[in-house]
């Protein structure tokens, strides 16, 4: 500890140095020490604020432009794990690669086993992030939801797709309802060729299925399996590419016109620009949920998902729509309203 400022050295030498000189040096050291204390405290507070105000402290991407790059944040370490929606797994994986490049002491890994499984897993604490096409309120109990924090990272359009040999290129919501309830079974009933419709559905628990059925059936209960129930969006891609006379549904990022055709709904093309104002009715917000007590690595990765590094470019590159581009919002009940 430095000597007390009030102390006056006698006018003698100490170790060959005049007492007056020692006092002057003490004052200079004291001032330098105070400056170091101040700067250290300021940097510490800035670091705490930077970590505390983002990550699992709020929801939505509206503050993304103000967050900057998580890659520039203070170095973090740890393991981030996720499960959930396969629809935007590619986006999460692409973002994870960039994040790990900038933060080599963090590993980010996971699976796309469906929104329901992802939400159940994050609520149980078996993963640190649950990815979902639907609000947690639609899949979990209220006491589970209250312990989670939602981060809305993108919006995705979803639409019906048909085999290459199918001549139908536009269906109404009423026609889709008939097909996916088993009431319409032949393509000629909707203006196509005389051929039996092969319905490829997603398994129960899929957020893509929940979003599609909510748009087509509203509040009506549906329990129609179709000819097959598939686990993931990638499985639908594969099956649609090898099956004639089939119909299914996929998010826009999984459209592949070399394997199947995406068709209009009510005369509206499945385009991102038509989703932003709700002209195209089948769409969902992509959610990433974490625990309120999430670790720093998870918080930092979610901050990165909302940063300009992801929202400014990567979201659209991966076939999604930035939340900031939307002119409307959709709540947990499915109600759409203007921003």
What are these language model-derived features?
Residues 1-33, 41-53:
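N-terminal secretory signal peptides
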Residues 14, 22, 36, 61-64, ...:
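Serine/proline-rich low-complexity intrinsically disordered segments, especially terminal tails, linkers
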Residues 29-31, 57-124, 128-142, 148-339:
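Exported/periplasmic ABC-transporter solute-binding proteins
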Residues 38-39, 168:
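N-terminal hydrophobic signal/anchor transmembrane helix of membrane proteins
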């Amino acid at each position: 500890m430095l000597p007390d400022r009030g102390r006056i050295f006698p006018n003698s030498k100490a170790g060959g140095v005049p007492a007056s000189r020692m006092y002057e040096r003490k004052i200079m050291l004291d001032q330098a020490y105070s400056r170091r204390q101040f700067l250290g405290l300021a940097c510490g507070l800035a670091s705490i604020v930077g970590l505390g105000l983002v990550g699992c402290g709020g929801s939505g991407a509206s503050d993304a432009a103000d967050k900057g790059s998580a890659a520039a944040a203070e170095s973090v370490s740890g393991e981030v794990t996720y499960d959930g929606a396969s629809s935007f797994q590619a986006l999460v994986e692409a973002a994870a690669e960039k994040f790990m490049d900038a933060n080599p002491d963090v590993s980010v890994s996971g699976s796309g086993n469906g929104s329901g499984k992802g939400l159940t897993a994050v609520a149980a604490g078996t993963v640190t992030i649950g990815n979902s096409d639907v609000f947690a309120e639609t899949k979990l109990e209220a006491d589970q939801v209250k312990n989670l924090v939602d981060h809305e990272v993108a919006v995705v359009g979803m639409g019906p797709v048909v085999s290459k040999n199918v001549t139908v290129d536009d269906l109404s919501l009423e026609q889709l309802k008939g097909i996916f309830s088993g009431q319409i079974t032949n393509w000629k009933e909707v203006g196509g060729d005389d051929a039996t419709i092969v319905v490829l559905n997603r398994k129960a628990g899929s957020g893509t299925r929940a979003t599609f059925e909510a748009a087509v059936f509203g509040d009506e209960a549906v329990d129609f399996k179709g000819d097959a129930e598939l686990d993931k969006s990638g499985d639908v891609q594969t099956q649609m590419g090898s099956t004639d006379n089939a119909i299914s549904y996929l998010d826009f990022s999984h459209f592949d016109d070399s394997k199947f055709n995406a068709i209009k709904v009510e005369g509206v093309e499945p385009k991102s620009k038509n989703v932003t104002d709700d002209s195209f009715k089948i769409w969902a917000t992509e959610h990433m949920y974490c625990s309120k007590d999430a670790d720093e690595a998870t918080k930092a990765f979610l901050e990165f998902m909302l940063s300009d590094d992801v929202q400014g470019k990567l979201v659209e590159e991966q076939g999604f729509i930035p939340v900031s581009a939307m002119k409307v919002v959709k709540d947990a009940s499915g109600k759409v309203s203007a921003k």
